[in-house]
C-alpha cells in the first residue's frame, strides 16, 4: 500500500520541534512505498500545482495530511491546496479520483487535549473542528 504524506507547516525548520521530528523520522525510514512532501518547501509562494498534486494523489492508496492546528483550522497553504486540488470534476461533482483512498490526519496543537472537549476551554472536540476533512474524505 503506497502512502503519501503531505506536510503543511509554515515554520517546519525553525519553529516546530514536534513536526520537524515527525518529518525527519518519516524521511529517515526510506520506505519505497512512502512519499513525504514538505508542501511549504514545494510551494513557498503559494501557487499550488494542481496537476502535480493530482498525480501524487492518484498514485497513493493512503493520504496523510500533517499540519499544526492554527486558530481552530489548518494553515493557509493547506486551505489553498484544498481549493486548487480538491476540485469539481476531479474529486467530486462527477469526479471520483479520491474514491477508495484512505485519509488520515496528523495534527499538532499548542494546547492540551483536555481543552478540546465539550466541557473544555474551547467547548468543541477535535473531531468536530476537523469535520470538514471527514466530509472531503467521504465525498
Map each language-model feature to its residues.
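Helix-loop-strand module that forms the ligand-binding subsite of alpha/beta enzymes
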Residues: 51-134
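Short, solvent-exposed amphipathic alpha-helices that sit
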Residues: 17-28, 125-139
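Generic recognition of short, well-ordered alpha-helical segments
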Residues: 17-21, 48, 76-80
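A short beta-strand-loop structural module common to alpha/beta enzyme folds
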Residues: 32-44
Amino acid at each position: 500500500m503506497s502512502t503519501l504524506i503531505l506536510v503543511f507547516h509554515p515554520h517546519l525548520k525553525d519553529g516546530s520541534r514536534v513536526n520537524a521530528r515527525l518529518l525527519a523520522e518519516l524521511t529517515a525510514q526510506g520506505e519505497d512505498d512512502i512519499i513525504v512532501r514538505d508542501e511549504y518547501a514545494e510551494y513557498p509562494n503559494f501557487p499550488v500545482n494542481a496537476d502535480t498534486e493530482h498525480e501524487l494523489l492518484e498514485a497513493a492508496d493512503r493520504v496523510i495530511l500533517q499540519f499544526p492546528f492554527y486558530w481552530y483550522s489548518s494553515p493557509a497553504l493547506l486551505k489553498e491546496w484544498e481549493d486548487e486540488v480538491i476540485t469539481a470534476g476531479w474529486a467530486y461533482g462527477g469526479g471520483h479520483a479520491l474514491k477508495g483512498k484512505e485519509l488520515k490526519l496528523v495534527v499538532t496543537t499548542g494546547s492540551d487535549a483536555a481543552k478540546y472537549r465539550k466541557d473544555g476551554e474551547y467547548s468543541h472536540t477535535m473531531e468536530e473542528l476537523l469535520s470538514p476533512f471527514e466530509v472531503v474524505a467521504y465525498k
